[in-house]
From Swiss-Prot:
Pathway assignment: Cofactor biosynthesis; thiamine diphosphate biosynthesis
The reaction(s) this protein catalyses: [ThiI sulfur-carrier protein]-S-sulfanyl-L-cysteine + a uridine in tRNA + 2 reduced [2Fe-2S]-[ferredoxin] + ATP + H(+) = [ThiI sulfur-carrier protein]-L-cysteine + a 4-thiouridine in tRNA + 2 oxidized [2Fe-2S]-[ferredoxin] + AMP + diphosphate; [ThiS sulfur-carrier protein]-C-terminal Gly-Gly-AMP + S-sulfanyl-L-cysteinyl-[cysteine desulfurase] + AH2 = [ThiS sulfur-carrier protein]-C-terminal-Gly-aminoethanethioate + L-cysteinyl-[cysteine desulfurase] + A + AMP + 2 H(+)
Native source species: Lachnospira eligens (strain ATCC 27750 / DSM 3376 / VPI C15-48 / C15-B4)
Biological-process GO terms, alphabetical: thiamine biosynthetic process; thiamine diphosphate biosynthetic process; thiazole biosynthetic process; tRNA 4-thiouridine biosynthesis
Keyword presence, Transferase: yes
A UniProt-annotated Pfam family: THUMP
Gene that specifies this protein: thiI
InterPro entries the UniProt entry points to: Rossmann-like_a/b/a_fold, ThiI_AANH, ThiI_fer, ThiI_N, THUMP_dom, THUMP_ThiI, tRNA_STrfase, tRNA_sulfurtransferase_ThiI
Lineage of the species this protein comes from: Bacteria, Bacillati, Bacillota, Clostridia, Lachnospirales
Protein's name in the database: Probable tRNA sulfurtransferase
Described purpose of this protein according to its UniProt entry: Catalyzes the ATP-dependent transfer of a sulfur to tRNA to produce 4-thiouridine in position 8 of tRNAs, which functions as a near-UV photosensor. Also catalyzes the transfer of sulfur to the sulfur carrier protein ThiS, forming ThiS-thiocarboxylate. This is a step in the synthesis of thiazole, in the thiamine biosynthesis pathway. The sulfur is donated as persulfide by IscS.
């Protein structure tokens, strides 16, 4: 029935002279989201709108599912597009549309007509009234409700084309990917970091990711789990380059030479350093973590202060003020929760002290890090140079 979809967007519409940049980015992201959907589609800007036109048979549910993952979209409207062949033809097309779209006609409705072509022989109010009358004649069981109608029939007269629609599927909102710079996500196998990546991507940030692998203490299953999480996030963010860093030797050196109650803090500081160096080499302008205040010992305010100190670029923590259940709710919504709870440990969960320090002193931490002098430099260089890069689309 539907050969086209009208794409509605929110914040993009107030971007002024730069609006076309955001619209073009949204068009690119829509095309990317549809690349694996069966069928052929033409995505284009026209008359201040974005349209997805189906050029071949397609699966409606699959198209809707793909488009609801595209940041920047606030609404997806399946539309019937007709040529302007006069009001009688329009009325017949509207009646045909309602007959096919709604099996149950015992509904309330409202007609909302809009014209960009002001030389149309009827004004919007006249169109509303005339179409409403024709609908009541065709379907006596339908009733008019101008306040809370069950069917809001939209009729848009744009040039020589008229859009007819009454269904609007909510989109995720946000901004198109790539319109707000690039950031490096520290991605673990937990619940929080995939959600953090999703949330910062929603604001238009292109995502790259770094995962710290510690074989043989962490398994290949743990690594595959993180790859699977990156694939889930990429459904929303677009392609992700996943940097897999072998962290075993650095972790062992910290374990052997530093106080055990400070292991997590010092380890996190080196993770941040490595992620920042990898990010700088690929054009990132910030780091993204899934840290939430007070959730674990390494995420107290004092601990975050210590880990932040090693960074020269900003660190974004999108879930920092969320309760755990709020984070879980988002992870279930985006489809990452079931993967995150698979029981495969990552390097953050091994060599954890029974009583880790919760109020670390930065000066003491830095003093204890000098125990690594003469050892850590070569290990750090090797970790960077041997990083495995996996492109996930």
């Amino acid at each position: 029935m539907y050969k086209a979809f009208l794409i509605k967007y929110g914040e993009i519409g107030v971007k002024g002279k730069n609006r076309f940049i955001f619209e073009d980015a949204l068009v690119r992201q829509i095309k990317f989201s549809l690349k694996d959907v069966e069928g052929e589609f033409d995505v284009r800007r026209a008359d201040g709108r974005i349209y997805v036109n189906a050029l071949a048979d397609y699966d409606y549910d699959e198209v809707i599912e793909s488009l609801t993952r595209v940041f920047g979209i606030v609404g997806i409207c399946p539309v019937v597009q007709i040529e302007d062949n006069g009001f009688d033809d329009l009325a017949n097309q509207v009646i045909n549309y309602l007959d096919k779209a709604y099996k149950n006609k015992n509904l309330t409705f409202k007609v909302n007509a809009r014209r960009t072509r002001k030389n149309y022989p009827m004004n919007s109010m006249e169109i509303n009234m005339e179409l409403g009358g024709r609908i009541l004649d065709a379907f006596p069981e339908m009733k008019v409700d101008v306040h809370k109608p069950e069917v809001l029939l939209q009729v848009e007269i744009r040039g020589d084309v008229i859009n007819i629609y009454s269904i609007e599927v909510p989109g995720p909102g946000g901004m198109p990917i790539g319109t707000a710079g690039k950031a490096m996500l520290l991605l673990s196998g937990g619940i929080d970091s995939p959600v953090a990546g999703y949330m910062v991507a929603k604001r238009g940030v292109q995502i790259e990711a770094t995962y710290f692998h510690a074989p043989p203490y962490t398994s290949e299953r743990a690594k595959q789990k993180v790859i699977d999480l990156a694939k889930i996030v990429s459904k929303y963010s677009g392609p992700i380059t996943l940097n897999v860093v072998n962290f075993t030797d650095i972790q062992m050196a910290i374990y052997e030479k530093c106080p055990h109650d400070e292991l997590t803090i010092i380890m996190r500081r080196y993770m941040m350093k490595i992620a920042e160096d990898l990010g700088k080499s690929s054009g990132c302008q910030g780091l993204v973590t899934g840290e939430s205040i007070g959730q674990v010992a390494s995420q107290t305010m004092a601990s975050l202060y210590c880990t932040n100190e090693v960074c020269t670029m900003p660190v974004f923590r999108p879930v920092i003020g969320f309760d755990k259940q709020e984070i879980i709710d988002i992870s279930e919504k985006i489809g990452s929760y079931e993967t995150s709870i698979q029981p495969f440990e990552d390097c953050c969960t091994i060599f954890v002290a029974k009583h880790p320090v919760t109020k670390p002193n930065l000066n003491i931490i830095k003093q204890h890090e000098t125990n690594l002098d003469g050892v850590i430099e070569e290990l750090y260089k090797t970790a960077i140079e041997t990083t495995e890069k996996i492109v996930i689309e």
